[in-house]
């Protein structure tokens, strides 16, 4: 997979395939940011990525802010949707998570607090291309 990269998904099965392809690229120290409207499939995509690494008990961290997972790799899955102030992210030590070279960080709704996201990241924007299709746009920032 090389970036930028775009794919259209017409079903959950196709989204799973896209997530599995993307999973092959991931390694410790990477930060992945998923942006998109409610219902575009950010959490579903993340769950499929985690499954490829042996994590089967994942759920959205909307209320917890961050969920840690251990499988073939260590993951920290963030959801910024319910965060009201940037200070809340600093209170949980967001900078320390981002510096962790031994884990993979996945952030949903990173566009809500772009100032805390490191420049080096992979950003995935998910949008509705029509009622039953999603467009996945991948871009890597160095």
Question: Which ranges hold each PLM region?
Answer:
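Short phosphate-coordinating micro-motif centered on Lys-Gly-acidic
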Residues: 3-5, 85, 95-142
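N-terminal pre-Walker A segment at the start of P-loop NTPase domains
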Residues: 1-21
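Short beta-strand-centered segment that lines the nucleotide-binding/catalytic pocket of NTP-utilizing
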Residues: 55-70
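Short hydrophobic/aromatic beta-strand immediately N-terminal to the Walker A/P-loop
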Residues: 31-33
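P-loop (Walker A) phosphate-binding loop of NTP-binding proteins
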Residues: 35-37
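Phosphate-binding P-loop
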Residues: 23-29
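Conserved lysine of the Walker
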Residues: 42
């Amino acid at each position: 997979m090389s970036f930028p990269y775009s794919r259209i998904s017409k079903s959950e099965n196709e989204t799973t395939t896209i997530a599995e392809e993307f999973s092959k690229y991931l390694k410790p120290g990477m930060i992945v940011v998923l942006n998109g409207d409610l219902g575009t499939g950010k959490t579903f995509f993340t769950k499929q990525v985690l499954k490829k690494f042996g994590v089967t008990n994942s759920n959205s961290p909307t209320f917890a802010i961050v969920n840690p997972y251990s499988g073939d790799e260590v993951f920290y899955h963030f959801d910024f949707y319910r965060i009201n102030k940037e200070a809340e992210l600093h209170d949980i030590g967001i900078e320390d998570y981002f510096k962790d070279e031994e884990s993979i960080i996945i952030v949903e709704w990173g566009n809500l607090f772009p100032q805390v996201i490191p420049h080096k990241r992979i950003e995935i924007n998910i949008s509705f291309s029509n009622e039953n299709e999603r467009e996945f746009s991948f871009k890597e920032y160095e």
